[in-house]
Amino acid sequence: MKKLEIDDFIACVFLVITITVVIVNVFMRYFFNAPLTSAEEIATICFIWSIFVGGASCYRKHMHMGIDILTHLFPKSMKKYLELFINIVVSIIIGVIFYLSVTFSIGARFKPTPVLGISSLYENASLIVGFGLIFIYSVNNLIKSIKTIAGKKGDMNV
């Protein structure tokens, strides 16, 4: 049986909660004419969490679409250096986005959500967790690229 990673598990849990809340709300609205007032906000928050944590999982597994037209222009001997350059750029960009997500979340922590009235930090923390995981994974890819160039074992498809 394949091992379930923590990011996969978290994304799946939030997606299941989203689907369950929406189905229960539809059932309550059409059969009892009594919709759950907070269902839409709960579903939205859970969906946001599933997107950002699921996005990190996809990044870890190299499942995002990419444009490899540029890599085919380089000789095979240069591809590992191009991959190192790409990993450096991605790590820097994701590091900046992670910093901005922390700054944004801290700034919005006192803003209550419209229906539940809870801190927006519960919603915005998904940015911190998602981009934090992507940053960790991108630094890991960067280290693997450096090991590959140095001639050590650094399988890029792990």
Range-by-range predicted roles:
Residues 1-158:
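Alpha-helical transmembrane segments and membrane-interface helix-loop junctions
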